[in-house]
Amino acid sequence: MPRRRRRRGSSGAGGRGRTCSRTVRAELSFSVSQVERSLREGHYAQRLSRTAPVYLAAVIEYLTAKVPELAGNEAQNSGERNITPLLLDMVVHNDRLLSTLFNTTTISQVAPGED
């Protein structure tokens, strides 16, 4: 009785499986490869783990979704139609976690720099 070989990584009828990017695997919108390239080019550390760019891409994606969402809610509550830099600044400073994260950040056209 002949033995059948089992193929690894094949999908379907003898076809090759498609490679899946780290961005797709992590179900993110921000490119994990771009984040990794930025981390490597920035020379922030001698070594970089495989999961650090994935984690950072997820954090960036979360922040870019959360801050405009909070600003939109604040704009609706105050009867405004547009999200302005002032609203963004107000949202960041009113949220405890965002306030500590952006403690030393100055948003342009909102708070003038110190002379």
Swiss-Prot record:
GO terms for cellular component: euchromatin; nucleosome; nucleus. One of its GO terms (molecular function) is protein heterodimerization activity. It comes from the Eukaryota. One of its GO terms (biological process) is mRNA processing. Signal peptide: none annotated. Residues 1-21 are annotated as: Disordered. Keywords: Chromosome, DNA-binding, mRNA processing, Nucleosome core, Nucleus. InterPro entries: Histone-fold, Histone_H2A. Transmembrane segments: none annotated. Residues 87-115 are annotated as: Docking domain. It is found in: Nucleus; Chromosome. Present in mature sperm. The keyword rRNA-binding does not apply. SMART domains: H2A. Belongs to the histone H2A family. In contrast to other H2A histones, it does not contain the conserved residues that are the target of post-translational modifications. Atypical histone H2A which can replace conventional H2A in some nucleosomes and is associated with active transcription and mRNA processing. Nucleosomes wrap and compact DNA into chromatin, limiting DNA accessibility to the cellular machineries which require DNA as a template. Histones thereby play a central role in transcription regulation, DNA repair, DNA replication and chromosomal stability. Nucleosomes containing this histone are less rigid and organize less DNA than canonical nucleosomes in vivo. The docking domain is responsible for the weaker heterodimerization with H2B. The nucleosome is a histone octamer containing two molecules each of H2A, H2B, H3 and H4 assembled in one H3-H4 heterotetramer and two H2A-H2B heterodimers. May be incorporated into a proportion of nucleosomes, replacing one or more H2A molecules. This is Histone H2A-Bbd type 1.
